[in-house]
Swiss-Prot record:
Coiled coil: none annotated. It comes from Escherichia coli (strain K12). Belongs to the phosphohexose mutase family. This is Phosphomannomutase. Keywords: Capsule biogenesis/degradation, Isomerase, Lipopolysaccharide biosynthesis, Magnesium, Metal-binding, Phosphoprotein.
Length: 456
């Protein structure tokens, strides 16, 4: 029995041909069907050149297991989340490799209610069945049906439920879809703005879906992927820039000067927006950078709740706490009314509304927060002995620390600064985040000390 290395901690990702092909996709579909025994599943795929063939092989596997398949076509991951909870079906699968290299593809799996299927919630079971490849013969009388459907209008209806269009004042927004799956959704949102008479102008960059990615793999988390958005904001004198990754489950924002705004500060903005409409609500945040979020949420009368990093953990904690919103510094934003799932479209709509309501630019909205809690940004270090390196750091600071937290890796808090150090769930690296209370030189000095200790 050959091990399928495309099964990762949270999803499926692999090199095409070697780790993921049509046969493996069929086996995954068959395994999903045999394990969960769903009646109906929704499928979608991103813009990658292999997504359609892998999706159809996946559909065949599901149908062979007796599952009815509803194919929503080219889509972002969140459209599969939406379709799953909106239609009330038994699960969904998006074929996507998000921001991975060209020669990769993958899948994200959910069950009923768009609940994630990850390592300890069924993904290992699906893997075991797919690896064994020992399925009962196909019963043609019980074979599932295949149907193509279009849910985009219903999805856009849902998105517009988060804002009041009457609050929008004249806005010029640059939107960079990175030739990914976001383009058609941006077109649908633009049409809806026009139909509602909203004074919003969208300047669309790389809006045409193209699996060859002529302008590079869209991953605005990388500084080298930000120039086109920044330059368009400056050239057009836009109020804000928005950029997406390939399956648009992450949304990256640029201010009116084309400056990239770290996701950490957007969490605070969105928390504030929700608390204005829902006083006293709970807000989930991750432990990597937290002081700004805790400060904003507390001042606005909400309750901040810390969760381990990662979509499966955040979603689970949000359900447990009945939190209205959860945010990670990695530009993943989760919404209770979106079945506790992450969306890349809801955040920029909310921020656009907030800019209008506050009558301030995005830069003005975040400037004070960035000054109050300056952060290093996430710094990745490849280390031969990561556990020993983390222990070395802990021993060095143990006497000085006012508090130590192990929700995710190790967080150590001091009077005027704090840091979080954790190993990656997906890569052989250690990730460091440092922040201070309004003291940039202190934050930078402590960051240098930590990096020196890690690399000794």
């Amino acid at each position: 029995m050959k091990k399928l290395t495309c099964f990762k901690a949270y999803d499926i990702r692999g090199k095409l041909g070697e780790e993921l092909n049509e046969d493996i996709a069929w086996r995954i579909g068959r395994a999903y069907g045999e394990f969960l025994k769903p009646k109906t599943i929704v499928l979608g795929g991103d813009v990658r050149l292999t997504s359609e063939t892998l999706k159809l092989a996946l559909a065949k596997g599901l149908q062979d297991a007796g599952v009815d398949v509803l194919d929503i076509g080219m889509s972002g991951t969140e459209e599969i989340y939406f379709a799953t909870f909106h239609l009330g079906v038994d699960g969904g699968i998006e074929v996507t490799a998000s921001h991975n290299p060209m020669d990769y593809n993958g899948m994200k799996l959910v069950r009923e209610g768009a609940r994630p299927i990850s390592g300890d919630t069924g993904l290992r079971d699906v893997q075991r069945l797919a690896e064994a490849n020992d399925f009962p013969p196909v019963d043609e009388t019980k074979r599932g049906r295949y149907q193509q459907i279009n849910l985009r209008d219903a999805y856009v209806d849902h998105l517009f439920g988060y804002i009041n269009v009457k609050n929008l004042t004249p806005l010029k927004l640059v939107i960079n879809s990175g030739n990914g799956a976001a383009g058609p959704v941006v077109d649908a949102i633009e049409a809806r703005f026009k139909a509602l008479g909203a004074p919003v102008e969208l300047i669309k960059v790389h809006n045409t879906p193209d699996g060859n990615f002529p302008n590079g793999i869209p991953n605005p988390l990388l500084p080298e992927c930000r120039d086109d958005t920044r330059n368009a904001v400056i050239k057009h004198g836009a109020d804000m820039g928005i950029a997406f990754d390939g399956d648009f489950d992450r949304c990256f924002l640029f201010d009116e000067k084309g400056q990239f705004i770290e996701g950490y500060y957007i969490v605070g903005l969105l928390a504030e927006a929700f608390l204005e409409k829902n006083p006293g609500a709970k807000i989930i945040h991750d432990p990597r950078l937290s002081w700004n979020t805790v400060d904003v949420v507390t001042a606005a009368g909400g309750t901040p709740v810390m969760s381990k990093t990662g979509h499966a953990f955040i979603k689970e904690r949000m359900r447990k706490e009945d939190a209205i919103y959860g945010g990670e510094m990695s530009a993943h934003h989760y919404f209770r009314d979106f079945a506790y799932c992450d969306s890349g479209m809801i955040p920029w709509l909310l921020v656009a509304e907030l800019v209008c309501l506050k009558d301030k630019t995005l830069g003005e909205l975040v400037r004070d927060r960035m000054a109050a809690f300056p952060a290093s940004g996430e710094i990745n270090s490849k280390l031969a002995q990561p556990v020993e390196a983390i222990n070395r750091v802990e021993q060095h600071f143990s006497r000085e620390a006012l508090a130590v937290d192990r929700t995710d890796g190790i967080s150590m808090t001091f009077a005027d600064w704090r840091f979080n150090l954790r190993t990656s769930n997906t890569e052989p690296v250690v990730r460091l985040n440092v922040e201070s209370r309004g003291d940039v030189p202190l934050m930078e000095a402590r960051t240098r000390t930590l990096l020196t200790l890690l690399n000794e």
